[in-house]
Amino acid sequence: MTKPNSLIFYCIIVLGLTLMKIQLSEECELIIKRPNANLTRVPKDLPLQTTTLDLSQNNISELQTSDILSLSKLRVLIMSYNRLQYLNISVFKFNTELEYLDLSHNELKVILCHPTVSLKHLDLSFNAFDALPICKEFGNMSQLQFLGLSGSRVQSSSVQLIAHLNISKVLLVLGDAYGEKEDPESLRHVSTETLHIVFPSKREFRFLLDVSVSTTIGLELSNIKCVLEDQGCSYFLRALSKLGKNLKLSNLTLNNVETTWNSFINILQIVWHTPVKYFSISNVKLQGQLAFRMFNYSDTSLKALSIHQVVTDVFSFPQSYIYSIFANMNIQNFTMSGTHMVHMLCPSQVSPFLHVDFTDNLLTDMVFKDCRNLVRLKTLSLQKNQLKNLENIILTSAKMTSLQKLDISQNSLRYSDGGIPCAWTQSLLVLNLSSNMLTGSVFRCLPPKVKVLDLHNNRIMSIPKDVTHLQALQELNVASNSLTDLPGCGAFSSLSVLVIDHNSVSHPSEDFFQSCQNIRSLTAGNNPFQCTCELRDFVKNIGWVAREVVEGWPDSYRCDYPESSRGTALRDFHMSPLSCDTVLLTVTIGATMLVLAVTGAFLCLYFDLPWYVRMLCQWTQTRHRARHIPLEELQRNLQFHAFVSYSGHDSAWVKNELLPNLEKDDIQICLHERNFVPGKSIVENIINFIEKSYKSIFVLSPHFIQSEWCHYELYFAHHNLFHEGSDNLILILLAPIPQYSIPTNYHKLKTLMSRRTYLEWPTEKNKHGLFWANLRASINVKLVNQAEGTCYTQQ
């Protein structure tokens, strides 16, 4: 048992170390990119751990060993588009890990070889070599997958040096002088899966080179120019006819073709009868007329034809002829893009077309109208054309009974909902209507079994309630419209992917996730979210779903309103439940008011709060009135701050409470027993000292109303109040006086007590301080001549 366990443990250790080594290797990748930096030499400050070095598009003219000697970890070196003229491969002898070397688009004329075996990618194309730069050392590059060469002379002897290598792709760029000493069989020994030959771009194609390399699966020929009618593109047609010898050839690509219409049809006809299965022609310039001829569609291996970017002169022949050639091709896949095609005929019989792509043309929505011979068609792309009426497309699709995918995006389609039957083909599963002029009415007529629907970049403001019930719809893209809410899944019960970013969604429905139980991907970012109470539940629901469901969260989900929250991520947006729940807010306010009311009632009952409030108001009013009385009026002949009138029964309170608390602040109080002048009548003394006092204080109590002299003093003071218009009466209620106990002849006292505010003597000692402060404030004024005595009267 011990030995097997030890073996297992050892294997685990080895596996862990191997994984760690791989991880460290990946983490140690150091890529240095300095393209287009006007460098004339390889920089000297390169890090020693550099693994990828890109020095393309500079002015480097020389590469020395010392330039890269220290870069022992270098695996990728890109020096294309420089000015290298000479190269000694020995400069890489210390870069034993070098695998990728790109020296294309330089001025190399001479190359000196050195043994190297690690290269997988070597590109010497687009240089100034006379003969192909193939050394015998190249034969040792057993790992070589890509080889780019260039030269004006191609000799079999050079090619034989690498004939035994199984290279995935060979790029051969022929110089402008190619053809002077041409060896037609020079490529016979090339062993590669993909061969790309670039012919001289400015010369007529009059080459004898045999391009039918026996091992080639994919062949690409660039710069084909044959426009001279006397030759009829015979050289190139002869080269194509030899392709029939290579039974392995499956892919043929022609780039940058300039020829006549007749030669173009001849090229198609020759390729039609070769082993080629996939034929692509791009960047074509056509001229001249097209002579009528029958096209032979029989005996072909071709499955797909792609024609891209065609420029032609003004047609001088009926276009229907060329359209009929294309329409009746017996292939499965047909692509014509960027050809300015304005129409396409319906095949004359049931077509084998499975996939048709007419992207970027000038087709109208009348294309294939009433065509019943495309019943096998599965995919149709009419992207970037001149389609305007969706109803016509609907009627056309109805006859394509096998159509599963339709792309009519980037047109000017409208849907008027004008009563035309919604007759989409029942087989349609994928529909792309993006970048058109469609509104929400399009939802009333959609293929019933569609699974993927793309409506982004239209003019949809809302999804009508009476939409077509798309029970099979799984993916819906309505991005870049004007929708104001997330659509529910009532009509889309199988919806799993929704893209609705860049709309006008401000308050997403809180029940979206409840309605769309099958949603697994939601992209709703970059909308003008209004961060208010209505958004809280939606943000909360996002927190309940898996993070990978909401695409772009949280970076693409930010507040747009209010201004104070603009730019804030919805994840960081918070509002208190109190501000958003009306019931809770009402209950909280009611409870708060109740607590305040109870607290106020308690304060009133326990601390007699109303009394304090009244005293404070009186003190404030007194201070306010004092500031508005002219100083001259106050100081005219006053000798006392106050004249005090009280009953003899209350004298103890006056002497023990009132006088000590008022006279300690230099306040002069007039009492009759201290200041009345002997010999004068009592009435004369009362009148005289009331006039010499700033205020008259009356200490009211049940004893006061029983005193006759107190009544006189009150009468004269009240008379003085109305005579001079002053506010000199202060009433102190020492003890409560019931209204019924006041004699009828004391009508002035009744009037004063009912109209004027009086000070009520508090029985609680803690209130005495405020009482005396209020009283002092009401009588405290600066006297010009301070009386030496104090006047008070006792009755």
Curated annotation (Swiss-Prot):
The keyword Acetylation does not apply. Residues 604-795 are cytoplasmic. Glycans are attached at residues 38, 59, 88, 140, 166, 251, 296, 333, 432. PROSITE patterns: LRR, TIR. Disulfide bonds join 113-135, 226-233, 346-371, 422-445. InterPro entries: Cys-rich_flank_reg_C, Leu-rich_rpt, Leu-rich_rpt_typical-subtyp, LRR_dom_sf, TIR_dom, Toll-like_receptor, Toll_tir_struct_dom_sf. Residues 638-779 form the TIR domain. LRR repeats lie at residues 54-77, 78-101, 102-125, 126-150, 151-175, 176-199, 200-223, 224-250, 251-278, 279-308, 309-337, 338-361, 362-388, 389-414, 415-437, 438-457, 458-478, 479-500, 501-524. Residues 524-579 form the LRRCT domain. It is found in: Cell membrane; Cytoplasmic vesicle, Phagosome membrane; Membrane raft; Golgi apparatus. GO terms for molecular function: identical protein binding; NAD+ nucleosidase activity, cyclic ADP-ribose generating; Toll-like receptor 2 binding; transmembrane signaling receptor activity; triacyl lipopeptide binding. Gene3D superfamilies: Ribonuclease Inhibitor, Toll/interleukin-1 receptor homology (TIR) domain. Residues 316-319 are annotated as: Interaction with bacterial lipopeptide. GO terms for biological process: activation of NF-kappaB-inducing kinase activity; cellular response to triacyl bacterial lipopeptide; defense response; detection of triacyl bacterial lipopeptide; innate immune response; macrophage activation; microglial cell activation; positive regulation of interleukin-6 production. Keywords: Cell membrane, Cytoplasmic vesicle, Disulfide bond, Glycoprotein, Golgi apparatus, Immunity, Inflammatory response, Innate immunity, Leucine-rich repeat, Membrane, NAD, Receptor, Repeat, Signal, Transmembrane, Transmembrane helix. It is a single-pass type I membrane protein. Residues 26-582 are extracellular. SUPFAM superfamilies: L domain-like (SSF52058), Toll/Interleukin receptor TIR domain (SSF52200). Residues 1-25 form the signal peptide. It comes from the Eukaryota. One of its GO terms (cellular component) is phagocytic vesicle. Pfam families: LRR_8 (PF13855), LRRCT (PF01463), TIR (PF01582). Interacts (via extracellular domain) with TLR2. TLR2 seems to exist in heterodimers with either TLR1 or TLR6 before stimulation by the ligand. The heterodimers form bigger oligomers in response to their corresponding ligands as well as further heterotypic associations with other receptors such as CD14 and/or CD36. Binds MYD88 (via TIR domain). Interacts with CNPY3. Interacts with neutrophil recruitment protein from Aedes aegypti saliva; the interaction promotes activation of canonical NF-kappa-B signaling in skin-resident macrophages and subsequent expression of neutrophil chemoattractants. PANTHER family: TOLL-LIKE RECEPTOR (PTHR24365), TOLL-LIKE RECEPTOR 1 (PTHR24365:SF261). Participates in the innate immune response to microbial agents. Specifically recognizes diacylated and triacylated lipopeptides. Cooperates with TLR2 to mediate the innate immune response to bacterial lipoproteins or lipopeptides. Forms the activation cluster TLR2:TLR1:CD14 in response to triacylated lipopeptides, this cluster triggers signaling from the cell surface and subsequently is targeted to the Golgi in a lipid-raft dependent pathway. Acts via MYD88 and TRAF6, leading to NF-kappa-B activation, cytokine secretion and the inflammatory response. This is Toll-like receptor 1. It comes from Mus musculus (Mouse). The gene is Tlr1.
